[in-house]
Curated annotation (Swiss-Prot):
GO biological process, one term: DNA replication
Compositional bias per record (Basic and acidic residues), positions renumbered to this chain: 1051-1064
UniProt protein name: Error-prone DNA polymerase 1
GO cellular component, one term: cytoplasm
Family assignment from sequence similarity: Belongs to the DNA polymerase type-C family. DnaE2 subfamily.
NCBIfam families, A to Z: polc (TIGR00594), PRK05672.1 (NF004225)
Gene3D superfamilies named among the record's database cross-references: 1.10.150.870, Metal-dependent hydrolases (3.20.20.140)
Cited function: DNA polymerase involved in damage-induced mutagenesis and translesion synthesis (TLS). It is not the major replicative DNA polymerase.
Keywords tagged on the record: Cytoplasm, DNA damage, DNA repair, DNA replication, DNA-directed DNA polymerase, Nucleotidyltransferase, Transferase
Reaction(s) this enzyme catalyzes, per UniProt: DNA(n) + a 2'-deoxyribonucleoside 5'-triphosphate = DNA(n+1) + diphosphate
Gene source species: Agrobacterium fabrum (strain C58 / ATCC 33970)
InterPro entries associated with the record: DNA_pol3_alpha_NTPase_dom, DNA_pol3_finger, DnaE2, DnaE2/DnaE/PolC, DNAPol_HHH, NA-bd_OB_tRNA, PHP_dom, Pol/His_phosphatase_N
Subcellular location field: Cytoplasm
């Protein structure tokens, strides 16, 4: 007797967000184990899982039946399966129509929509009860879809379930609609039931105790083997066999999805390839005015040949058109990534770095014929003007042929723990406490940390919360839009993949993310935003206005000694790429003295080189402490620039090619295998080939294995050399601007917020340390952006000195429109009073409160915070007509200062500082630590400045506000902490044991005291932490009131993820309150993490 056969046609993956509880890979692996022949993936109103399901089906040898569950109006649900490519296109268009109609995250479709787009679709009705409504729907189904109409039979595990199936089967037979068995799978194994209950509760925003019948009523929605399905549906053998029948009828496969890039007609009468070649050769003299080097010419011919064979010319023309448009609108942009390996991209001006100077010209790192993947060019634009470029792409290529990729937002450790805790009914303060102990996105909280928090791990709900949170990590939560990854198509894009509206206006996204489109081989062009480009563009504009000289990234003064002297001292706060604490600790040791040193600096502080044990050998050789030896001349040619240490991906590929006889494509496969060896295990075959090849070419076997170990260590994290050079160019330009024009640099970076590693408070403090005068926000002198004001003084060179005037953008809660109204209203004359500003600018009182809390009335109107707030409360909507007429005749305003004077108690100095931080994000008054210094000195806690001056080996204790916690990706797990007090900054190093011992303090404290040993290595000074103390409570004594205001934090703190709030957003705020004298004012430090 033959084994029972069955195809499961109703499988919901976790891409039905907060419904399914298993991934595609888990489902297809289980299907293979159970002997199921095919799986029909039918997520709700979505094809989001299809690329992953396609990949999983190929990996496990189980056939994929592409489908979708449609929830129509009138509570009607059907399963649909496209039989061919044309039907698939219609299904994509149908979903796009519903998503456009429903708005973000929703899909609204009717029966008429289904009928209109239903040609070629098999439609399976999902019916619950055999009632009159079901009979009507069956008749309509049969009339519309004839032999493509079916009805599903599924167990609901309720009383009279068999009777329900019998009645449904009889009703379908009477209507001439065949039935098919489905199991309505939500998870692959029974053990996943609890997680499915949890995501259901998250979806309904309720606890597990409140869920009731919103949970599945039974635990039967797991995948079952064919034998079990035949046992359960023994009375319906035909319905079981029809599962295979439908699978056979649905012949469409994702491999039929032929993507065609739009044909670019840049030059009429020429093909895309001819146009590209013509444009490239015409652009050569501009890039190489002294003639094209033979090596570069050979590479250019090779690249054009490869592009021609792979038919990628149109792609290069599109990217070129986008870059040319940006430059025509004076938008600063620069290509990066592996595209910087391409001479074509350099010649056309897409990238700024000549790959002939900075790489081994391994074009296959960018485009490989054997890899079968399309190229991927990343171009960075000013983050504040990138939207102009995005809208130009939509307008040029058409909204039916252009869309952004989506990003699948997945659960991270902290979010998973928080949501699971809420579902299980754990107290909110407990879940906050637990989640605050999670460092990385994939990290959980272990039993040890729970015990340190004095919690009982024997508590069933607490233990269950950890188990379920670990299962939830990595599960899709919702779709969001890619930062700028565009997919363009020759034909309608919505016939390839469903399109939905993005959260932002005038944008649309496809349902698939960047990994999905790699599977189906769509080409993507990345229009990315880089804050430092906005900063540099603003800086160049200010510099041109001052000096008349025009600067850009490609024309910076080369190898400026003063700039590199500043870099060597690690005076790089605010610059690009070399501003992190890990980078700053490396700079005085590596001592970059020319541009290529900066390229190495950018690349070396990366997890790969650290894990590959390449940093210390390079530093020793650079300092002359270790000889630079090469086994063979081939290695010297490849590694000479990096002193015999492989730091870049191109070097790894060139070693394989020149020393082990790899082809260019094999070398690229080696690089890709290194990037995934932990998961795939394909690295072993390349190890044998590399070692054997090197030995055959005369290398010692031990040496060959050592080289492989180094390459293996940095494969997944190593920079392409030309990519590092692209970043180094911006790093150098930002450092040059900071070195020679610190006032312009400070202004530009403040006007480009949010961006960078540090908060405005640290940027302003650093500028003041460099002699820049910074002036407060002022209602009569501040524009929206920060500006430069002449001081009437001269610098050492006899040039005019300028002060930075903080702009209205710094005032939290003040909208852009209200700021513009204020600036426009004072064009003729300055404001004379609060009342004058209110009446002339026409802004609401809430905007005035924002200004008063930011102390913006003090500089010109001499009104302190409390006086200004009191004046705002005294404002009248309209004066009486008689007094108004008199005021007009007198050309005067009705001043609030004519009210009876009230003696308001002035705020304390500490209270003013707290208010500054709370409403401007920084203070130009005393540092908060100044008010605590006397108490700290009594405890023999020294200042940060004193700590960094003492001799090596000194034991001491210092304290400060926590600016940054950084955990570079190294095997040793060292953690950097940066503390700030009124005298400066101190850097602490925590080894793993210390971190684990004081984990709660490290992750939670806003102010810490650190006792440890000073370690000096040249100009690098670290405090190696031995003991940490949480001093956050001390900050409560700085002010007078109990309202907690956050001390602004840098985006560089790795513990906190995401972007800081845009303080320009309009927010509802309470009316100004009375400031009671006995209230306690407090600073609350919230730091953030940055990997």
């Amino acid at each position: 007797m033959s084994a029972p056969r069955y195809a499961e046609l109703q499988v919901t993956t976790h891409f039905s967000f907060l419904r399914g509880a298993s991934s595609c890979d888990e489902l297809f692996e289980q299907a293979k184990n159970l002997g199921i022949e095919a799986l029909g993936v039918v997520d709700r109103n979505s094809l989001a899982a299809i690329p992953r399901a396609y990949e999983a089906a190929n990996n496990h040898g189980v056939r994929l039946v592409i489908g979708c569950r449609l929830d129509l109006d009138d509570d009607l649900s059907v399963l649909v399966y496209p039989m061919d490519r044309a039907a698939y296109g219609r299904l994509c268009r149908l979903l796009s129509v519903g998503k456009k109609r429903g708005g973000k995250g929703k899909c609204r479709l009717s029966w008429d929509d289904l009928v209109a787009y239903g040609e070629g679709l098999i439609v399976v009705l999902l019916a619950d009860l055999a009632d009159d409504l079901c009979a009507l729907r069956l008749r309509r189904l049969k009339a519309a879809f004839a032999d493509r109409a079916y009805m599903a039979l599924s167990l609901r595990r309720r009383p009279n379930d068999q009777m329900r199936l019998f009645e449904l089967s009889g009703m379908a037979q009477a209507a001439g609609v065949p039935t098919v068995v489905t199991n309505d799978v939500l998870f692959h194994v029974p053990e996943r039931r609890m997680l499915q209950d949890v995501v259901t509760c998250i979806r309904h925003n309720c606890t597990i105790d409140e869920a009731g019948f919103r949970r599945e009523r039974h635990a039967d929605r797991y995948m079952k083997p064919p034998e079990e399905m035949h046992r359960l549906f023994a009375r319906y053998p035909e319905a079981l066999s029809r599962s295979l029948e439908i699978a056979k009828r649905c012949k469409f496969s994702l491999k039929e999805l032929v993507y065609q890039y739009p044909e670019e007609r840049s030059l009429p009468g020429l093909t895309a390839q001819q146009a590209l070649e013509k444009m490239v050769w015409e652009a050569v003299p501009g890039r190489y005015p002294n003639g094209l080097p033979e090596k570069v010419e050979k590479a250019l011919h090779h690249e054009l040949d490869v592009v021609g064979r792979l038919q990628y010319a149109s792609y290069f023309l599109t990217v070129n058109a986008i870059v040319r448009y940006a430059r025509s609108k004076d938008i600063l942009c620069q290509g990066r990534g592996s595209a910087a390996n391409s001479v074509i991209c350099f010649v056309l001006g897409i990238t700024a770095i000549d790959p002939a100077l900075f790489s081994n010209l391994v074009f296959e790192r960018f485009v490989s014929e054997n890899r079968g993947e399309p190229p991927d060019i990343d171009v960075d634009f000013e983050h504040q003007r990138r939207e102009e470029v995005i809208q130009w792409v939509y307008d040029t290529y058409g909204r039916d042929k252009a869309a952004l990729c989506s990003v699948v937002t997945r659960y991270r450790g902290r979010g998973a723990l928080r949501d699971v805790g809420k579902v299980l009914g754990l107290p909110e303060d407990l879940t906050k406490l637990l989640s605050s102990q999670v460092w990385r996105w994939s990290e959980g909280v272990g039993e040890k940390q729970v015990k340190e928090l004095n919690l009982n791990m024997e508590d069933r709900r607490l233990k269950l919360a950890f188990e379920l949170a670990n299962q939830l990590v990595g599960t899709p939560r919702h779709h969001s839009q890619h930062p700028g990854g565009f997919v363009l198509s020759h034909d309608r894009l919505d016939e390839l993949v469903p399109i939905e509206p993005a959260a932002m206006n005038d944008r649309q996204i496809i349902e698939w993310d960047k990994d999905d489109i790699d599977i189906v081989k769509f080409m993507k062009m990345d229009c990315l935003a880089l804050g430092m480009l906005s900063c540099m563009k603003r800086g160049f504009d200010l510099l041109e206005a001052r000096t008349g000289e025009k600067y850009d990234l490609a024309a910076m003064p080369p190898d400026d000694p003063a700039t590199f002297a500043m870099i060597q001292k690690a005076d790089t706060l605010g610059t690009f790429q070399i501003e992190s604490r890990a980078q700053m600790s490396m700079l005085p040791r590596l001592k970059p003295a020319k541009f290529y040193d900066l390229v190495i600096q950018v690349a070396i502080v990366r997890p790969g080189p650290i894990q590959g044990d390449m940093v210390h050998p390079y530093l020793r050789r650079r300092q002359g402490k270790e000889p630079v030896l090469y086994e063979k001349p081939q290695l010297e040619n490849i590694l000479k620039k990096t002193l015999g240490v492989p730091l870049f991906q191109e070097q790894a590929m060139r070693i394989a090619m020149d020393c082990a006889d790899f082809t260019a494509d094999e070398a690229d496969q080696l690089r890709r295998a290194m990037a995934t060896f932990k998961n795939v295990g394909t690295i072993s075959k390349f190890k044998e080939k590399l070692v054997t090849g090197m030995v055959a070419n005369g290398y010692d076997k031990e040496f060959a294995e050592r080289i492989f170990k180094q390459l293996e260590g940095f494969g997944s994290y190593g920079f392409p050399e030309s990519h590092a050079a692209s970043f180094a160019l911006i790093a150098y330009a930002s450092s040059w601007l900071k070195c020679h024009h610190p006032d312009i640099f400070c202004t530009a970076i403040l006007n480009s917020q949010p961006m960078g590693f540090y908060a405005p408070a640290q940027i302003v403090r650093d500028a003041r340390d460099h002699g820049v005068e910074v002036r407060p926000v002022c209602v009569n002198n501040s524009r929206f952006d920060c500006t430069l004001e002449p001081t009437g003084k001269k610098n050492d060179k006899g040039e005019e000195r300028f002060a930075v005037r903080l702009g209205l953008r710094m005032v939290k809660g003040l909208s852009n429109d209200h700021a513009a109204d204020i600036v426009a209203a004072r064009q003729d004359r300055p404001f004379a009073s609060v009342d004058d500003l209110w009446r002339r600018a026409g802004v609401p009182a809430a905007a005035l409160v924002c200004l008063a809390e930011a102390d913006a009335f003090l500089p010109s109107l001499r009104l302190a915070r409390r006086e200004a707030l009191w004046a705002i409360k005294a404002l009248r909507d309209e004066p009486l007509p008689l007094f108004a007429a008199a005021a007009i005749r007198e050309n005067a305003v009705i001043e609030e200062l004519q009210e009876p004077s009230v003696a308001l108690r002035p705020m304390t100095d500490g209270g003013e500082v707290v208010q500054d931080y709370g409403h401007v994000g920084l203070t130009l008054r005393e540092h908060p630590m100044t008010f605590l210094r006397r108490d700290l000195s009594r405890r023999r806690i020294v200042t940060c400045a004193e700590a960094v001056r003492v001799r090596d080996g000194t034991w001491l204790e210092t304290a400060g506000l926590v600016l940054v916690r950084q955990r570079p990706g190294s095997a040793k797990g060292v953690i950097f902490m940066t503390l700030e007090d009124e005298t400066g900054i101190a850097n602490a190093v925590l080894w793993v044991k210390t971190f684990e011992k004081y984990r709660r303090v490290v992750l939670s404290a806003g102010m810490v005291g650190i006792y440890g040993k000073i370690q000096r290595e040249g100009e690098v000074v670290h405090l190696v932490a031995h003991r940490l103390t949480d001093l956050s409570h001390a900050l409560a004594s700085v002010g007078e009131r109990n309202n907690a205001f956050p001390l602004p934090h840098g985006r560089g703190d790795e513990f906190h993820h995401g972007m800081p709030d845009d303080h320009r957003a309009i927010r509802k705020r309470p009316p100004p309150s009375n400031h009671d004298d006995d209230e306690v004012e407090r600073i609350k430090v919230i730091s953030r993490n940055f990997h």
